[in-house]
Amino acid sequence: SLQGLGTGTVVLGIHIAAPGLAIQPGDALDETSRARLSTVYMPGYKITMLPQDVVDAYTLSEGRAVPAVSLYVTLDEATLEVKASETKLERVPIAANLRHDQLDALVTEAWLSGADVSNENTAQRLPIQREQLSFLYRLALHLKAQRERVRGKPETFNRPDYNFKLVDHDGSVPTGDEQVAITTRQRGAPLDLIVAEAMILANSTWGEWLKSLSVPAIYRSQASLLPGIKVRMGAKALPHAGIGVPSYAWSTSPLRRYVDLVNQWQIIAAARHGKTAALAAPFKPKDAQLFAIISAFDAAYSAYNAHQGSMERFWTLHYLRQQGITELTASLIK
């Protein structure tokens, strides 16, 4: 959400679904999500971390008011300097969901700058004004440039994301005989960048906030960009060289990653109790449970990603067979 555009001071709202307001550590839903640790994705199907009716109840779907953990960031409209941030637990009315697959062709750099008016009739039906999206895109570019200065080199999006879709599939477990369509989506498109930078801003801001309150959280860190230096998960707020932020706590996907749900519980405690949050948070400093969760999540997440990769390879080979492709032209780089 965006408030104050044109006044010189803008308030950006980043609103995250809040299952952590209802699910409590140790209850039945916590046990279910802790057993699965993450939603598992594969072409045409997914196994959700939480029961589907719980996901449906808390997801930020348009046309209703839903519980949210909201981060409000106050910015200077001209310089984009962050002046303040505040976290609120609230019910947020969702006016509209903007979807990449429907809008990437319309929301381009040229359209945001006003240079492209070819889709003006379609744009008039958008539930958000071009001026708002233009500001969000300018902010996203600014945040990305700031991170790249810390990284020491720019991020590149040379490889597209591949989307796999099973044609006319009803969402049931695939048999392997379905017709598959494979499309590409170039990373770094305006909507993609706006969402990505907002999530990074939330994860890094909340990570630093929890650190300042001595509230434990699960962080991702990377010591440097040197070859062989991997991203690690731990309970210490350390810099993430790959992203270019002083600390990074996954907190923006609590419906599909258990680490984010754990961090959301800690954020909720911080929002409710402020400076005494460390005493009220579910997980205390050096909590053995926190380290057990990190270990279990690391193993499960790696296995799930490997499974997703295997399934995508299967459907890629299936696609080649369906299309009758027997020969490909390639470039070999030694």
Language-model segments: residues:
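Electropositive polyanion-binding surfaces
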Residues: 1-334
